[in-house]
Amino acid sequence: MKVKSKMNDNEKNNRIISEYNDLKNKINLWNKAYFDYDEPLVEDSIYDATLLKLIKFENQYKFLDNSDSPTKNIGAKVSKKFSKVQHQFPMLSLNKAYKFDDLKIFERHINKLGFFPNYFLELKIDGLSISLKYDNGNLIQALTRGDGISGEDVTENVFQIQDIPKQIKYSKPIEIRGEIYLSKSTFYEINECQKSQNLTIFANPRNAASGSLRQLDSSIVKERKLNSFFYSVTNPLDHKIKNFNDQELFLKENNFQVPSLNKFVDTIEKAYEFIKDFEKNNYREKLNYEIDGIVVKVDDFSLYDILGQTSKFPRSMIAFKFSDISIETKLIDIFISVGRTGKITYNAILEPVIINGTLVSAATLHNYEYVESLKLNKNDNVKIIKAGEIIPKVVSLSKKNSETIFKRIEYCTSCNEKLVQPEDEVDQYCINKKCLMIRLRKIEHFASKKAMNILGLGFQNIEKFFKLGILTKYSDLFFLEKYKNLIESQPSFGEKSFNNLIESINRSKSNSLEKFIFAIGIKQIGERSAKLIANEVKLLSNLINFDFEKLNNIRDISCKTINSLKCFFSDENEIEEIKIILELGLDFKNLENEFESKKLQGLNFVITGTLSKPRDFFKELIIKNGGNVLNSISNRINYLLTGEKSGSKIEKAQKINTIKILDENEFNKLI
């Protein structure tokens, strides 16, 4: 068995290496086409998605040879067309924020060092980064970002851009950084011209600006009518520039173009308010140039060296990316999923793209009415969004490549039973209680994190155990222990996996009634409703014969919810399941405001490293004893619970005298 396992590991590693090399080769091909021939082969979002996948491979599989990886570079490789010149000071990228919590983490690092600065907000121009050097008032060099260490010398072409000053009043040597961009109106004109000459059109203004600046014929650069914005003086304190107000005055006095929509705020909360207001009022669409976010910068330049930087990002600024950015991609296929209640959902398989820092390859299409309203079918181009933390969603058809609309599904894709659609609903349902997919999804939901939180029981294992006949309904979970030999004989499921699963199942027996009510998958019952019902019912044994009309007095319980409860508990199979649970002695109760003890009441914990049990086990234990579990080290933390490979959190905690660092044994004594 050991030999077989070793062979399987070798085969797996070879597959990983092969896929990793394919990703590297693909990105190298795209880089060559883009930087050597000004010919982008894929959308930026697809490029970013592939690069993100490469990064995930490198983080997960440490045996990979990443010495020649594109991830070693801040940006793109330097083009061979133009001479390569090293930057005097690296041109770093910006770290990204997608939600308010990201901004708070950014601010927390600054506050921990004892600083509470004002912030300057500026538009993040979606263009090509450029660095200009002036000496004795004359423009002497223009470099692109390149890989952040070295850039391309595009000085001759930059001289063709009308709004970039070739001479300035300031006579000392100085470096000014900004963005070269193409306005939306000019972008449209260029593409119309390209079409009329049967030439390839540009995918977006940024690609057009980048391609234009890299033209060998500088007269073409002049024709393209590129524009610029400048936002940074390198080493500003050397030029008696102390903050962004000083810098903006300096740039304007020397005839540099500066974005008009800038803002000063004194808290990160006000920064977020400005960003949300900017999005709400759709100011972005009113601009004649593309932006992809707002940059939040510490206003006091004297803090920049103190705050420092990582190998890629300065810690004095962060780019907030808009949450409602839509990305165009191809709808490769439409597939149907059957949920635990029998609800039919139409889903899109997409050409992978990145939205809000997340790799997206699928999105919901909700129901057939939604598909029909957008006139969607396979191979169409669509726009998708992922606002905040919600599931990615197809919002519009951007290009109709197919001739028809996807056909409505009339029969369940799992059991082939005729689907029904209630008069007052837009969704279709499979009502066959024996439908395989409904049964599997019910068990999956029961074991899910927000329900009974049974670890080590993914959908594939549920399906496997179902076929073995040992898990056909959720109550069977509590009898799996007697199938130890059978389960351990399954591929990729050894003794350790089995023991972890059984331990997690046993731990779920101490869950609250609200968790159980949510877990059994009653239509219309979410986490909030389950909590309200549990508060009234108190015990699982009361649930079967409970008068649900009593719930009419609860504001957030609707008549529809009550009818759904009545329907569910009129099903003999569902009643039988609950009776089995009760016979096991599992009379789940309402644990509202009830702790196992109050030993940890009001104490804040952070957990780090590898412990003897899953991290969620310790998290639940802390919460049940009245404590709180937070994600990051700060002055609010009382204890840091550490395991093996704890990393940087220990170092951060040691700098704050009030935090006590515990190992697992010390934690157990505390409990």
Swiss-Prot record:
The keyword RNA-binding does not apply. It comes from the Bacteria. Its EC number is 6.5.1.2. InterPro entries: BRCT_dom (IPR001357), BRCT_dom_sf (IPR036420), DisA/LigA_HHH (IPR041663), DNA_ligase (IPR001679), DNA_ligase_AS (IPR018239), DNAligase_adenylation (IPR013839), DNAligase_N (IPR013840), NA-bd_OB-fold (IPR012340). It catalyses: NAD(+) + (deoxyribonucleotide)n-3'-hydroxyl + 5'-phospho-(deoxyribonucleotide)m = (deoxyribonucleotide)n+m + AMP + beta-nicotinamide D-nucleotide. One of its GO terms (molecular function) is metal ion binding. CDD domains: BRCT_DNA_ligase_like (cd17748), LIGANc (cd00114). Keywords: DNA damage, DNA repair, DNA replication, Ligase, Magnesium, Manganese, Metal-binding, NAD, Zinc. The keyword Ligase applies. One of its GO terms (biological process) is DNA replication. Residues 595-671 form the BRCT domain. Its cofactor is Mg(2+); Mn(2+). SUPFAM superfamilies: BRCT domain, DNA ligase/mRNA capping enzyme, catalytic domain, Nucleic acid-binding proteins, RuvA domain 2-like. Zn(2+) binds at residues 412, 415, 430, 435. The active site is at 124 (n6-amp-lysine intermediate). Gene3D superfamilies: 5' to 3' exonuclease, C-terminal subdomain, BRCT domain, DNA ligase/mRNA capping enzyme, Helix hairpin bin, Nucleic acid-binding proteins. NAD(+) binds at residues 44-48, 93-94, 122, 145, 179, 297, 321. It is an enzyme of class 6 (ligase). Belongs to the NAD-dependent DNA ligase family. LigA subfamily. DNA ligase that catalyzes the formation of phosphodiester linkages between 5'-phosphoryl and 3'-hydroxyl groups in double-stranded DNA using NAD as a coenzyme and as the energy source for the reaction. It is essential for DNA replication and repair of damaged DNA. This is DNA ligase.
